[in-house]
Amino acid sequence: MKYFVNADFALSRPPEGPVAIYIIPFAEWLVDRGYGLVSTRNQVLMAAGFSSWLRQKGIGLSDINGEHAGRYLLDRVQRPKLGDDAALRHLLAFLRSQNAIAEEIEVDHNPSAVEQHVQAYERHLRDARALSRQTIINYRPVVRDFLSFRFGDGEISLAQLRAADVTDFVQKKVSRLNMRRAKIVTTALRSFLSYARYRGDITSDLAAAVPIVANWSLSSIPRAIGRDDVSRLLSSIDRDTPIGCRDYAMILALARLGLRSSEVVTLELDDIDWVAGRIRVRGKHGRNELPLPADVGEAIADYLWRARPRNASRRVFLRDKAPIRGFVGPSGLGSIVRRSLKRTGIDSPTKGTHQFRHGLASEMLRGGASLGEIGEVLGHRHVQTTAIYAKVDLDALRTLALPWPGEAQ
């Protein structure tokens, strides 16, 4: 008896095993992410075979993990094909999204001395401190580098740590880093040393020995792309293609609204009020509502009407390759900008997306806008953040200078 997965294909028999009840939802999940009929069918067949194998091995749904997927590929009679491994990864990701199986925990069965300490610290951050996954990802390599710097491949005795070890490591580590990364290093190191003292591995407060990274927030001038280069870049995009239509709208939003890349990629359909001509932005400090310039609105509408794939996602801008969904993070837009700059041959001061934000602020300053007005558009919470743009236009600054007492008028 055939088992119809959807209107387009069926399995030769009903699936069996712990994953059987998830076969149809898994197929729908794949279709929603833009996978074609052939790819969806192949992945569903792989999932059904995996489920049968799990049943034969007596493995329950809640016990499934990545190791089982690897064993199944080795046990199969059929020769592994390109895409088999990816199909099982997608299935496990889907099952985790349904809370059917636990999140995968990477286990090193023969960890080094350094790695044992890193893993214990990671468990502390996750279980005792309940820190976010991204924070743990940021802290782990710092601790690994610090322990390797001090102890190498030898035995680790945290009781031997001295303040000089801490300062030497920080000085060598942060000399090559920008301000943001340097602060992550010092914060992670303080966290680890506080943890070590809490455990009794060290008795001194070595966290206090971690140097403070100076924060000269106004020490550098923002590197802004010029207005002519923005026009040239936008003109170079082929808006007759779906990808070009999307890229044009996204880059125009960067340039005309001064949005952060994360704010562009997280825009949702409900954030745009077409009648009032307003757009809601999810900024660093909550939501901010801005007027929607006509050219930006027209570009977004053109993309939605002509080029956006049909998809259940509420994100405005979607990826062009499967899985079809919103961008996972701002790096996708950064790649679009870098490719566009390279294609056009524009020698911009930087290759990132923030140059458009700086460019808008500089143009507003030259046009007579106050720092308060610029900060409101950019979503700055404090005027000190916006004050850095006052260094950009010396001619504008000269008009603000007061005459010295007694100076000839």
From Swiss-Prot:
Limits of the Tyr recombinase domain: 220-402
Catalytic site positions: R260, K284, H354, R357, H380, Y389 (o-(3'-phospho-dna)-tyrosine intermediate)
GO biological process, alphabetically ordered: DNA integration; DNA recombination; establishment of integrated proviral latency; symbiont entry into host cell; viral genome integration into host DNA
Superkingdom of source: Bacteria
Gene Ontology molecular function: DNA binding
Keyword set, alphabetical order: DNA integration, DNA recombination, DNA-binding, Plasmid, Transposable element, Viral genome integration, Virus entry into host cell
Residue span(s) of domain Core-binding (CB): 112-197
Similarity comment: Belongs to the 'phage' integrase family.
Record's protein name: Putative integrase/recombinase y4rA
